[in-house]
């Protein structure tokens, strides 16, 4: 489960061990809904309080040959505007202006999810 959180025309991303930027999130635990998983992961990884709103898309990402993961991306809204705090799970975190996303080293699926959620957020106002 991955979450797209947009604040002030910027999206929060974390840098992983492969030096790629990615959406924050994580794996489901037993008896946990996808929405519960995402809220828990955002709190653990970034100390952000979010509410997952809708599934944006899903896709399979091949990390290395023979190792693939199913990515399900949600559009999320913040339930409070806490300052994001980096956990030890990632190398860095940063709020990127939406206009910079396409130039980042990150899987195209994440970029598509960010574009989709950004368009929905703009449409709602």
Where are these regions (language model features)?
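Conserved N-terminal beta-strand and adjoining loop/helix that marks the start
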Residues: 1-11, 58
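Structural motif
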Residues: 10-11, 20, 27
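Short loop/turn segments immediately following the C-termini of beta-strands
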Residues: 16
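Nudix hydrolase/Nudix homology domain
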Residues: 20-21, 88-125
């Amino acid at each position: 489960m991955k979450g797209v959180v947009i604040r002030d025309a910027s999206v929060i991303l974390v840098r992983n061990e492969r030096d790629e930027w990615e959406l924050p999130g994580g794996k489901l635990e037993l008896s946990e809904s996808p929405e519960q998983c995402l809220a828990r992961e955002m709190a653990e990884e970034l100390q952000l309080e979010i509410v997952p709103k809708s599934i944006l898309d899903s896709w399979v990402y091949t990390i290395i040959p023979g190792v693939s993961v199913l990515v399900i991306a949600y559009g999320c809204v913040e339930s409070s505007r806490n300052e994001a705090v980096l956990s030890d799970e990632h190398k860095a975190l940063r709020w990127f202006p939406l206009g910079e996303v396409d130039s980042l080293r990150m899987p195209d699926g994440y970029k598509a999810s960010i574009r989709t959620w950004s368009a929905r957020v703009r449409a709602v106002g």
